[in-house]
Every structure is written in structure tokens, then in C-alpha cells.
Amino acid sequence: MYTRYKLSILFFVINFYNILCMPLSCETECCMAGKKYDDAAIDRDLCVLLCNLQYLASSNEGIGEILQCCLSSNYTSKTREDLRNCIAKCPPLPDRGCTGECCDLRENVDSLRANNPLGCCNDYTKVSSSSLNEDDVIDCRKSDASCEDRGYLLVRNNGSAVCIPENSKNDNIGFYFGSECSDLSRKG
């Protein structure tokens, strides 16, 4: 009974630690939605502004009289309905998406992957796997067999990219990145 209790506590601690040390939490799609949201919010605000300007321009009264009318809430239901109809035609806002540092890092990872699709280690700083902490790496790829300089291409959480030798072992890194870097956890 006592052994089962210790094992369950150990299991809980390991899982909790793994959850806290995951790589990037934001996906590319979420970051793209965040960028589109900002543009869509500006477009909607401009549309609403144009509706309000059309409403003001369509009045035969002077601007002072229009402002007095609006401040005293004496405008007619017809003009108010026209304004509502105009605003209803404005584009809706999409989901907010993701923004911030996570998206900046995600963009850097996506850019590095696009610029080096094979994951070759040419022109990248070589480091030993023991010099890396598990919370320091946000992306990992194994170089393609066609690369002249092969290894594991890693992106650190500061945005820099480094390579570790192909025969490296680091149990803390390979686990998170699926099949691409799982060999890091298996080599002896």
C-alpha cells in the first residue's frame, strides 16, 4: 500500500513537471488569427465611423444642431434605424487568436523551418546536449540524411538556433517533440 502511494505521488509529480515544461503553447493558426483580428478590428471601426459620418452628412441641419440633437437623444427612429442598418452591414470581428511573445517565437520557429526544410546543421553553432536545459528548447528537428552536416537542430527560447551532434542523448529534450527527436531519449 505504501509503495503504491509513493509511486502514485511520483507519477503525479512527473506528469505535473512535464505539463509545465512543454514547448510553445501557441499554434501557428492561433497566431495568424491574432494578426487577422487586429486588422479586422481596424476595418470594423472604420466601417462604423463611415456609417456615423454618413449619418451626420445626410442631415440638413448644421453640425451644432446635429450634436445638440444627438446629445439630447431627440433623433428620430428612422435615422437611428438607418444608422443601425449601416452598422449591421459592417464586417463581424473574428476570434481574437493569440498574440505576444509566444507568437513571436512561433514565427521564428516557422521561419527557421521554412528557410532550412531539411534541418541541416551547416552554419549553426554546435553545442553539447548536456549544456541544454529542458526548458531552454522550444523546437527540435533531426537533420535529413541528405545533409552534409547532420545532427539535431534546436531552437532555444531566446530565438537562437543551435545544433547538437547526431549521436547525442538528452532525456529531457527528445520526449516533447515526437518522432523527430525521440532518438535523443533512446541513445546510450
Swiss-Prot record:
InterPro entries xrefs: Chemokine_CC_FPV060
Protein name (database record): Putative CC-type chemokine FPV060
Family matches, as Pfam families: FPV060
Family: Belongs to the intercrine beta (chemokine CC) family. Highly divergent.
Lineage: Viruses, Varidnaviria, Bamfordvirae, Nucleocytoviricota, Pokkesviricetes
Key words, A-Z: Cytokine
One function term, GO molecular function aspect: cytokine activity
GO cellular component, one term: extracellular space
Regions crossing the membrane: none
Species: Fowlpox virus (strain NVSL) (FPV)
